[in-house]
Amino acid sequence: MRPCGSVCQHRHFRHAACGTQPLPWRTTAPEPGAPPHEHLSARRKIHSVSPEYEERTSRLPGAIGWVQGAPGCTGGGETTTVLPDGCIDLLWTAGRLLVSGPDTSAYSTHRGFWVGVRFSPGIAPALLGIPAHELRDQRVDLADLWPGAGTRRLTERVDGGGRTRPPPSRIWHCGVAADAEPVDPLLRAVVVSLEAGRSVTATADSVGLGARQLHRRSLAAFGYGPKTLARVLRMQRALRLARAGVPFAETATLAGFADQAHLARDVREMAGSSLSELVER
């Protein structure tokens, strides 16, 4: 895991109490035909999924809870690779609450016991009260975003004294600013358009924004400009196709790459591995 940065220590946000009504987490699979980014499957985020991994999809759009490992598990020094997917995660591990920002390249982190909530692109910044570009490529302690004793108390309540596995819903409530703004539906439209392979220009036109406006909104909501988000989503489309057994040449065409060589370059640059290596893991 990259060292946690110190981000926006001058900002102060109110916190939602951890004791509020828990979210309706469920362990059912997504509806057939649902867009891949709705489910936010861990196979997009973590491509080495252990038998101890459990996902909990939520009726709240754009969020999924997950647990990996068991209390006391240290991972034995093993690591797992996290790929860029445009998402932001709120994480709990070893008594710490962390925010994992949107990534532009793959990184390795230790296994062990993790509990988290993953938010699809554009969801978390409004809930956390922090622009996504300030979290890009970082793993940040929640206390650095929300300074003060309140964050420490919230962490202790999520931890539960170390006796039990903290549910994702408890982490959710401890990581949402009480004055959080509602998520702009325009952001969802941007993601859907780019996920479908539309160009940045066509996407901007479809939501009624100019190129500069879209870029500015994208930095705050997704952590990077629309071209980078489109590139990340395109790589994820290719991974889903390749893992489903689609030949690489056909995968390149269906995912929106110019050719198979273009696909290979993009995957190597963002994931640090070849497409065949990712599929085999």
From Swiss-Prot:
GO terms for molecular function: DNA-binding transcription factor activity; sequence-specific DNA binding. Residues 21-42 are annotated as: Disordered. One of its GO terms (biological process) is response to antibiotic. Residues 184-281 form the HTH araC/xylS-type domain. Residues 201-222, 248-271 bind DNA. Keywords: Antibiotic resistance, DNA-binding, Transcription, Transcription regulation. The keyword Transcription regulation applies. SMART domains: HTH_ARAC. Pfam families: DUF6597, HTH_18. This is Uncharacterized HTH-type transcriptional regulator in mcrB 3'region.
